[in-house]
């Protein structure tokens, strides 16, 4: 079993309030539901224009986990283009 975490940092320049930020994150999380991954906001909860998402995937092979999380990163950029400032992939098992 392979477990991996994708850490994605976002900068949301058009967010003027936490409500605006939450709308963007909800849109992203809803679109990621089709990938069968767990998604949570892990940092910057009280900052309007920044967000960090932790996305976890589990599979039997490292190649499948890596491909799945690469697809997730592509989907985030497709849903909200230009907002991703940094991504980091970490294997836990």
Which residue stretches match the model-derived regions?
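Short, charge-patterned binding micro-sites
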Residues: 3, 41-61, 92
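Short glycine-/aliphatic-rich beta-strand segments at the starts of folded cytosolic domains
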Residues: 3-14
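Amphipathic alpha-helical assembly/interaction segments
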Residues: 11, 33, 37-41, 53
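A generic structural motif
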Residues: 12-16, 59-61
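C-terminal binding/interaction regions
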Residues: 21
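Short beta-strand elements
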Residues: 36-43, 83-89
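C-terminal structural segments of small proteins and small subunits
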Residues: 57-93
């Amino acid at each position: 079993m392979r477990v991996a975490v994708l850490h994605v940092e976002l900068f949301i320049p058009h967010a003027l309030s936490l409500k605006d930020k939450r709308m963007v994150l909800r849109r992203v999380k809803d679109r990621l539901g089709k990938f069968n991954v767990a998604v949570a906001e892990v940092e910057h909860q009280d900052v309007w224009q920044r967000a960090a998402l932790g996305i976890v995937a589990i599979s039997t092979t490292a190649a499948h986990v890596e491909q799945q999380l690469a697809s997730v990163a592509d989907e985030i950029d497709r849903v909200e283009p230009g907002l991703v400032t940094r991504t980091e992939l970490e294997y836990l098992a």
